[in-house]
């Protein structure tokens, strides 16, 4: 799949936020390893069920009458959330990040952006949670709640014995199918061809997902955001690396 992200409109959308915002955290103070052991999460607090989750802690009164619909899994420094927020201002989006310092950075950046745009109410629809999506996804989201899920430049876990730690596995794909509504979309991108093939294989093999065609991907404005919105994506570009995107649609459940 080769979707060209380089045209004037997409370049504008993909540029990192450059506005001067008082109180923005400095990323150099929040540096952490690029990836984290998904089993090192013993101090994470999570809701017993989605009914126990109080989203007002993340969104304030903006959560009233709304439910989270977009989930960026392993959101890193939150670049995708910042890009999608003005595109879908009425949609609640959550970034899930297991690394403590990184999730703290994203939260402080969101708070600073909200304060700076307080009169206009921008960025109230995005938030971050420190959580392990590999373990606790059904604790946060109800069946069919999400309309979009994002897996951007996930940890490739190169060693064969660690493939079970990859964020796309047969078991996890079934969980994603549970929380994703019919016609919902899973977006993936990586600079590791082996990981791309792995993710495509397991999503293709699941009976509740089908891959979008090239034309469907080109028609989706969100696809352009996958390439450059994240720090990892920008790093791949600087190193002249190749990026492999794929998008999958959640199919209706088969009749009983």
Swiss-Prot record:
Localization per record: Nucleus
PANTHER family: 3-DEOXY-D-MANNO-OCTULOSONIC-ACID TRANSFERASE/TRNA GUANINE-N 7 - -METHYLTRANSFERASE (PTHR23417), TRNA (GUANINE-N(7)-)-METHYLTRANSFERASE (PTHR23417:SF16)
Identification of the protein by name: tRNA (guanine-N(7)-)-methyltransferase
Function recorded in the entry: Catalyzes the formation of N(7)-methylguanine at position 46 (m7G46) in tRNA.
Catalyzed reaction equations: guanosine(46) in tRNA + S-adenosyl-L-methionine = N(7)-methylguanosine(46) in tRNA + S-adenosyl-L-homocysteine
Organism ancestry: Eukaryota, Metazoa, Ecdysozoa, Nematoda, Chromadorea
Sequence ranges of Basic residues compositional bias: 26-36
Pathway recorded for this protein: tRNA modification; N(7)-methylguanine-tRNA biosynthesis
Region annotation (Disordered) ranges: 1-43
Domain of life the protein comes from: Eukaryota
Active-site feature positions: 155
Family named by the database record: Belongs to the class I-like SAM-binding methyltransferase superfamily. TrmB family.
Gene Ontology molecular function terms on file: tRNA (guanine(46)-N7)-methyltransferase activity; tRNA binding
Alphabetical list of Gene3D superfamilies matching this protein: Vaccinia Virus protein VP39 (3.40.50.150)
